[in-house]
């Protein structure tokens, strides 16, 4: 099994991970927001409530044991550049995805706003895994397994969390 090197960093309590794609920004946006696209690498989603600010979605994480369904609130959506989401439930968290295009390359910046830096040890490897699934989906490559990311990347993120 090949171990994936961690790429994320911490900026205060924000976990930041980037990926680059040789594709137009609109194409990458579609991979992130179209239910048929997300169903192939992250999981399907559907609108629950589109009545105004804080529109709600339900999503299924197909890579997680038991394929759990959860809900989240869309806090901001500036197509095709920025998406901010807050998950619902007792373990709620917020994250943002920003896309920037330069020439024929689109850079995705993922930011998870952590309540506590120490949580990076658990969240970092998971987001590395999911963002690599997106890369592999877009490039037609076989998906990797979560155990290639966790626990091998956990110490990297714990070390980052220990640096103030």
Regions found by a protein language model. Give the residues of each.
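A short beta-loop-alpha structural element at the N-terminal edge
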Residues: 19-25
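Short, highly charged C-terminal tails/helix-capping segments
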Residues: 136-164
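A detector for short, charged/polar N-terminal pre-domain segments
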Residues: 2-8
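Beta-strand/loop substructures that line and gate deep hydrophobic ligand-binding cavities in soluble
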Residues: 84-138
